[in-house]
Structures are given as C-alpha cells and as structure tokens.
C-alpha cells in the first residue's frame, strides 16, 4: 500500500462518523442542568455542549462507538501523514519535480493537527477546556497583536460564549473542505507525475513500474480501506479514548493529573511544560518567551524548515535535475541525520508532556524532572544527528548496503601470532556469498505488462 492510500482512507471514516456526531451535538456554552442517564453527573450544572456529548455517549445507540471511531480515525490520519512524510523525506521523494506536492503534504499535516485540536475542544470537558485556555494564552502571547487576535477568535475574554460555534464551523465545514481539496490536488499531481520508485531491475528515471489502476490497484485500495475501518472499529470497541464523563465539565478552578493531549499535540505540550520563565519588554509590550518560543517560534521553525528543505537542499548540493528514483537514506547522510535530529527533538518533547506522571512514578521532584528534560532537549538532537551521520557514512562507504562483507578467519602464524585473513570463497556456499543473488525482475524494459505478476511499465 502507498502512503497516500494510508493517509486518505481514514478521511472517509472521519466524514462518516463526523456526520453522525453532528446530528446530536449542540455547540452551546449555555449552562443547563444535566438529567441524563449518567448518574454521577445528574443534577449538576454543565454547558449544553458537554451535556449533549454525554447524552451522545450514553443515551444514543451506537453514539459512544461513533465518538471513539471518530477520535481514533483522527489519530490514525495524523499518524499516517507523519509516517508518509518521513518516508518521502528520508528517500528524497520531495525533490524536483515534486516540491509542490511536498508543500501540499506539509499543509495537510498542519491542517490535520489544527482540526484535530478543534474537534478535541468541542465537548467542553475539563481536559478540552484546559486545552482551550492554553490556546487562548498562546494567542495572547503573539507579540503586538495577541490581544486583538485572541478577542477576535474567542469573541471576547475566555471562555466566551461563541467560541464552540466558531470551532464547529471550522472543524466540520471549512478545514475539511480545504483538506479534501488539497488531497484532490495531491492525487492529481501524483497521477500526473507518476509515483517514485527505488532503483531496481527494469526501473529507470524515464519509466515507472507498478500495478495498473484497475483492477489491481483499486482492488488493493478497497481491501485496505476495509482493513483500516475494521482496525479502527476494533480499537474503538475495546480501547477507551477521551472518556469525558470521568473528567467532568470544565472548571477553571480544577486541574487534572496524568492526562495528556493526543500524540500530535504532545510535543507542543511538552515544550510549554519545560520552557523556563523568561520575559522581556519591548516597545512597551511584554513578551512572555516561556510561551512565545515553545508554542509559536519552535513549531514555526520545524514546519518552516520542512517547507524550505527542498529549496535548501537544492541550493547546497547544486542538484537541479529531475528525480524519479529514490535514495537510500544511508546514501544522503546530512539529510537523514537532520531528519533524525528533528524526530529526536519531538520525541523528547513528547516525553516531557508527561513530567507529572514521571515525577510521581519515580518519586522525584517535578522540578528535577523539568531540569533533566531541558538538558535532554538540548543534547539529544545533536547526539542523534552525529550517531545517524556516522551510521549512514559507514553504510555509504560500502559499495552496496545489502552486500555481505567478505568473512575473515583467524589464523595462527609460525611465530604464534594470531592474524585475520580473508576466508576462501566457495561458489557453492551461500554463506560466503559476497553479493546477494539477483532475483529476476517481474518485468523487463522491453515488455509492458507481465500477466503473471500484474505489474506494468509505462514511459513517464
């Protein structure tokens, strides 16, 4: 299965379950008395949005399953985009002529993260309300225009009265429409440019080897869709996610423990947790760097670097050629090491989003954990870069990364010294084979279709 399939298929699950949820959800922050079937909350004053979400979970047939499928599909969708983009980056599939598609993929990832956060905020429970409060503070931290921006989006001071209605419009209509349009553009460019491929028998820069669209590719895609839907349904049925009835309604005076955001927001939460207190005053405006840097500057640097990387690599290497064959990651050490460093940084920040759990589990002061995570944030990415660079250089120095090195055997000289000498090569001994056996190609460059394998070669 291609990465595009993996990324696109959860969209259909999100759309189907989202329509179901929209039939019952009410984005109202008006206080009502809950009288539903969930006994611990009966008689409490909650927002109508929270009450309707609880009703959807306990009083609507199949409602909880739909909620969980929607949530799990969102996580699968974002995770698939991340994995797909990592594959594209490490193999160099973003190079000319696919720079535009790379930018579209970056934009899709950004929109998916933003839309996931908007949907996560709609139930108005304690955790999502806390996330909204953090988002409001991040908007306030924008230098110069933060106050105006926060008031414009929230319709006034936090929590406001119309923010959920606005978020629902963005979450259910505006951003999904943009995502669908960009997925369509992504697929159009993919069909027009054809897919990339690793070097191999019969594969050149001027042709493309793969399965025909119909029936092979469409059959695989249909089967894979049902596989994704089945896995999502099983996860939703047996693995609980976002149990808002346990969190309760949002209350600014309450906090929660051992509750982290979805994984795609973990790096941002971790960065905010470990950022040291640091503020400056410039032109009469207070700049809270403990919020501005981890929540605005750092994500901007990461995503900005992703956008400009194709042009940056082209400028540094002077490579302006068109590429349809992929690189082995080991053949481009700088690129691979840079990607590994960024991934290491996000992993460390993701772990930092659980500082409270780590401190409690290890019985260590929270302040100590914060200091340790700050140090790791600084030293782990360079270490990851250096180690990855050395590994790639070692693999690149070998003529073929998959070739076995010539084995040695230990021999004793007449003087009693032990030395390593190359072992004798035996043609009939696979253990001493210096290079892998070439498996016959499914197709040859002179034939278009191999009926036995269903593969096809076409000119670009």
Feature-to-residue mapping (PLM):
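Juxtamembrane/interface segments at transmembrane-helix termini
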Residues: 21-31, 119-129, 187-199, 234-250, ...
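Contiguous transmembrane helix-bundle modules in multi-pass membrane proteins
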Residues: 301-302, 309-327, 333-421
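Transmembrane-helix bundle segments that line or gate the permeation/cavity pathway
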Residues: 11, 20-30, 72-95, 102-103, ...
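Long, contiguous internal "core" modules enriched in hydrophobic/ aromatic residues
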Residues: 165-166, 170-174, 178-258
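Individual transmembrane alpha-helix segments
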Residues: 60-72, 156-177, 274-300
């Amino acid at each position: 299965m291609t990465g595009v399939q993996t990324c696109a298929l959860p969209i259909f699950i999100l759309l189907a379950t989202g329509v179901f949820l929209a039939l019952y959800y009410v984005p109202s922050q008006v206080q009502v008395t809950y009288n539903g079937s969930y006994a611990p909350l009966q008689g409490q004053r909650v927002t109508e949005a929270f009450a309707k979400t609880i009703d959807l979970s306990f009083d609507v047939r199949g409602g909880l399953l739909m909620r969980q499928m929607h949530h799990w599909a969102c996580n699968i969708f974002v995770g698939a985009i991340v994995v797909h983009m990592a594959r594209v980056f490490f193999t160099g599939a973003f190079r000319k002529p696919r720079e535009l598609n790379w930018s579209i993929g970056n934009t899709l990832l950004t929109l998916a993260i933003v839309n996931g956060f908007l949907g996560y905020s709609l139930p108005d429970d304690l955790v999502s309300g806390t996330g909204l409060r953090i988002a409001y503070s991040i908007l306030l931290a924008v230098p110069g225009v933060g106050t105006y921006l926060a008031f414009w989006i929230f319709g006034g001071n936090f929590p406001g009265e119309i923010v959920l209605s606005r978020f629902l419009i963005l979450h259910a209509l505006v951003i999904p429409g943009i995502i669908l349009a960009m997925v369509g553009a992504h697929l159009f460019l993919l069909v027009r440019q054809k897919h990339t491929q690793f070097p191999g028998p019969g594969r050149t820069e001027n042709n493309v080897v793969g399965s025909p669209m119909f029936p092979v590719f469409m059959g695989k895609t249909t089967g894979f869709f049902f596989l994704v839907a089945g896995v999502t349904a099983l996860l939703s049925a047996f693995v609980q996610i976002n149990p808002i009835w346990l969190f309760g309604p949002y209350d600014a005076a309450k906090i929660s423990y051992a509750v982290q955001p979805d994984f795609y927001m973990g790096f941002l939460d971790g960065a905010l947790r470990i950022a040291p207190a640091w503020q400056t005053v410039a032109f009469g405006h207070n700049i809270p760097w403990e919020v501005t840097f981890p929540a605005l500057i750092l994500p901007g640097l990461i995503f900005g670097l992703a956008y400009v990387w194709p042009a940056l690599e082209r400028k540094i290497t002077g490579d302006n050629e068109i590429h349809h064959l992929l690189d082995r990651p080991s053949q481009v050490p700088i690129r691979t090491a840079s990607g590994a460093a960024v991934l290491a940084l996000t992993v460390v920040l993701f772990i930092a989003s659980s500082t409270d759990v780590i401190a409690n589990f290890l019985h260590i002061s929270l302040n100590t954990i914060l200091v340790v995570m700050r140090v790791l944030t600084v030293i782990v990415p360079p270490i990851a870069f250096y180690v990855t660079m050395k590994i790639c250089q070692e693999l690149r120095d070998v003529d073929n990364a998959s070739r076995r090195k010539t084995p040695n055997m230990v021999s004793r000289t007449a003087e009693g010294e032990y030395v390593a000498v190359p072992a004798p090569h035996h043609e009939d001994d696979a253990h001493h084979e210096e290079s892998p056996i070439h498996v016959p190609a499914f197709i040859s460059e002179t034939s278009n279709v191999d009926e036995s394998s269903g593969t096809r070669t076409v000119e670009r």
